[in-house]
Design a protein with these regions (language model features):
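Charged, alpha-helix-forming regions
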Residues: 1-247
Length: 247
């Protein structure tokens, strides 16, 4: 037998009303927090695009536009794809088109690199970054191009620049978009002065912290509100023993 409380009908109605109110407030708060995160991300992208624009870079000196292939070394020939069944779990990140997809027990690169998505719907959808930096020991499959950039500042600059760019003109394939090597290496990129490079990268890092700090605190804030709801729910559903009935 399960014992359940049977409070007066008016008490039941009031409890339901209060719990519904809590549920509504929690949903509204989550929506507001998500909207704030989206607003911060949009703000970051606005300032990023401004800082990476030709006019902004030119305030610190001359800016040359060059093909990406002239300022990076392509290391795609060293990539090795591994089927899921062939991977042995380990400590080293295994990268694909959208970033880390697994961790394996070995590595094929041990250096600072810039990876760029080679294929996948995200090349058009852009819900995730298509360029991402790695450092240290990693494994990369054949769904991400591997680029070596001599300057760490320029690598970070190129990462941000490629993520801000509309890649449609450089893609092939309609159902499965692909950024092949020739398309990637032909992308025009700015080659600014060291001063402009350092200024842009440092400002972008500060702006990114503005977004990531808030994003990191978002799950904790939502969890705290849920815990608060559960606390009051449990209190509201606690009744004296005389109101409990066997059913």
């Amino acid at each position: 037998r399960i014992q359940i409380p049977v409070p007066p009908l008016e008490v039941q109605r009031e409890i339901v009303r209060i719990l519904d109110q809590f549920t509504t407030l929690e949903a509204e708060l989550e929506a507001e927090l998500e909207a704030e995160l989206e607003a911060r991300q949009a703000q970051y992208e606005h300032y990023r695009n401004h800082l990476l624009s030709y006019d902004s870079l030119a305030t610190c000196g001359p800016v040359d536009m060059v093909e990406l292939g002239s300022v990076v070394t392509l290391l795609d020939s060293r990539r090795i794809p591994l089927k899921k069944g062939d991977r042995v779990s380990g400590e080293y990140p295994y990268y694909g088109a959208s970033g880390i997809v697994d961790y394996v027990d070995s590595y094929i690169f041990d250096e600072d690199l810039l990876l760029v998505s080679e294929d996948g719907a995200n090349l058009k959808a852009r819900t995730k970054p298509i360029a991402f930096s790695t450092s240290g020991r990693v494994w990369v499959n054949n769904h991400a191009h591997v680029l070596k950039v001599e300057s760490s500042f320029y690598q970070k600059f190129l990462e941000e620049y490629l993520n801000s760019l509309d890649l449609e003109p450089y893609l092939v394939g309609s159902t499965q978009p692909k950024l092949n090597q020739s398309g990637l290496l032909s992308i025009p990129v700015p080659l600014p002065t060291e001063q402009a490079l350092e200024r842009s990268v440092l400002l972008l890092e500060k702006l990114k912290l503005f977004v990531t700090d808030f994003s990191a605190g978002l799950p904790a804030e939502i969890a705290a509100r849920r815990a608060q709801y559960e606390h009051y729910r449990d209190r509201l559903l606690s009744f004296p023993e005389k109101l409990v009935s066997d059913r």
